[in-house]
Amino acid sequence: MLSRLMSGSSRSLEREYSCTVRLLDDSEYTCTIQRDAKGQYLFDLLCHHLNLLEKDYFGIRFVDPDKQRHWLEFTKSVVKQLRSQPPFTMCFRVKFYPADPAALKEEITRYLVFLQIKRDLYHGRLLCKTSDAALLAAYILQAEIGDYDSGKHPEGYSSKFQFFPKHSEKLERKIAEIHKTELSGQTPATSELNFLRKAQTLETYGVDPHPCKDVSGNAAFLAFTPFGFVVLQGNKRVHFIKWNEVTKLKFEGKTFYLYVSQKEEKKIILTYFAPTPEACKHLWKCGIENQAFYKLEKSSQVRTVSSSNLFFKGSRFRYSGRVAKEVMESSAKIKREPPEIHRAGMVPSRSCPSITHGPRLSSVPRTRRRAVHISIMEGLESLRDSAHSTPVRSTSHGDTFLPHVRSSRTDSNERVAVIADEAYSPADSVLPTPVAEHSLELMLLSRQINGATCSIEEEKESEASTPTATEVEALGGELRALCQGHSGPEEEQVNKFVLSVLRLLLVTMGLLFVLLLLLIILTESDLDIAFFRDIRQTPEFEQFHYQYFCPLRRWFACKIRSVVSLLIDT
């Protein structure tokens, strides 16, 4: 009896798993879930802990054992999705950026979105020009330390905060000047609201970049925003497709297709190549979810989307949440006392270390910095050409690297939007989707060359540490060998064409074989049809019937009788 109770209790313990979720303010929430707990259960626990009602904009992100990032699906089991050993570690992040963050109903929601965009600014996902960068950083400063006080804030106090991947003394002085003269008297809530209003006007607001390559092999970043699909190359936005113009999203292997229908019945297919099939599928699922959330009027219009082709079954996916319009209508009905907000304040965060000095660019003369940058970019040409590398954007101190975009689109009337100027270029963007094998090392190597430091969050999410100087030199020596071993998109397209031809040939042969068997069965049957009577009277059929079909039939009958008799005897 005692052993039975002990075994039952041990089984119940094995069915419970510890989960740690890192929040946007870098604190952690730990809970225990059952083995069969769905993602919705964990998400509801988290939102209850945060006292969050407008929760549809947020999601939980995790990294699988292959270093591929995913959004937790709320309709599926948490344990089955993670595929890793407990305890589980995940991150709470903004999944769908509100089209107008200032219009959010509750201050707690605005504060969480503010933390996400501040993180985007630091990691290089939110690109902007110098004047906009200084204003955004000043808003953050006002929200975190309050009004300027000469007794508390000595000269150069703004340099103690890391707002961007890179910064200069000139930018620091501009931030401090705005903070001193323009923002005095603003409360944290007001500064955060002004920050959101400014960020929402930027071209890269809501961008969660996926590293890819175009058909020419040039590095590109694909992203989905509240307003449509964007493609970024260098420091420019080269494509912007509104959601009502996107007719279909599809992927096959590492190839991602975007079908576009514009005015005057112009149909376009944009083609890009992801580093791995898993990264391409993640990109496709993100596109399906974003299109459903921002484009549809109600969730009942959501349909299951398939990536299948003519002969083979592909992936199927369905967005399971509410759409943006429904979320706004639900938010308008919220009537409660505003919850208390515990702001992080001056506590050093893992994503924005308050005391850590980032790379400052004024210690080297401008002309020399430009020459150094050009030599670095020349050394990284092979890295950019590798399908397994992390695409590297050019920094702001040299000529802007903007490769020619080639796709199925022959004529484009789009204007190329410059999203960052020479004084500010976050070249060390933390990519949301890990690339293939060796990609993490290559990304860290490029960051070492550009002089940027990895945040603690990046190290934890990637589960890898920054390489030492010796490791960096060793990796640098292996770059050319790695790059020479990887084929480009053109060779990949040829391989895909050959595979498709082989598939078509196999399917055709299979169909012919089935038709031949069906014809033999019908002609050997007693079916009295003129067509089959004519076939039976031909010399060829009589020869086939007596020399091949009849002996084969007798052989099968003999085998069947022997098997039956064996079964009866046993």
Curated annotation (Swiss-Prot):
InterPro entries documented for this protein: Band_41_domain, Ez/rad/moesin-like, FA, FERM/acyl-CoA-bd_prot_sf, FERM_2, FERM_central, FERM_CS, FERM_domain
Q: How does it assemble?
A: Interacts with CTNND1. Interacts with ITGB5 (via cytoplasmic domain) and ROCK1.
Residues crossing the lipid bilayer are 504-524
What does altering S354P do? In NEDEMA; uncertain significance
Summary of the function given for this chain in its UniProt record: May be involved in regulation of cell migration. May regulate cell-matrix interactions via its interaction with ITGB5 and modifying ITGB5 cytoplasmic tail interactions such as with FERMT2 and TLN1. May regulate ROCK1 kinase activity possibly involved in regulation of actin stress fiber formation.
Q: Which organism is it from?
A: Homo sapiens
Organism taxonomic ancestry = Eukaryota, Metazoa, Chordata, Craniata, Vertebrata
Q: Does the keyword Transmembrane apply?
A: yes
Query: Which intervals carry biased composition (Polar residues)?
Result: 388-398
Compartment annotation: Membrane; Cell junction, Adherens junction
Q: Name one GO biological process term.
A: actomyosin structure organization
Gene symbol? Answer: FRMD5
Q: Which UniProt keywords apply?
A: Cell junction, Disease variant, Intellectual disability, Membrane, Phosphoprotein, Transmembrane, Transmembrane helix
One matching Pfam family: FA
Keyword Transmembrane helix in the entry? The reply is: yes
Per the database entry, which stretches of residues form a coiled coil? Answer: none
Location, primary (coarse class):
membrane
Q: What is the effect of changing Y546C?
A: In NEDEMA; uncertain significance
What membrane topology term does the record carry?
Single-pass membrane protein
Name the CDD domains on file.
FERM_B-lobe, FERM_C_FRMD3_FRMD5, FERM_F1_FRMD3
Effect of changing S349R: reported as: In NEDEMA; uncertain significance
Region annotated Interaction with ROCK1 sits at: 308-353
Q: Which disease is it linked to?
A: Neurodevelopmental disorder with eye movement abnormalities and ataxia: An autosomal dominant disorder apparent from infancy and characterized by global developmental delay, intellectual disability, speech difficulties, ataxia, seizures, and abnormalities of eye movement.
Region: Disordered; residue ranges are 344-367, 385-407
Q: Where is the FERM domain?
A: 17-298
The name this protein goes by in its record: FERM domain-containing protein 5
Q: Name one GO molecular function term.
A: protein kinase binding
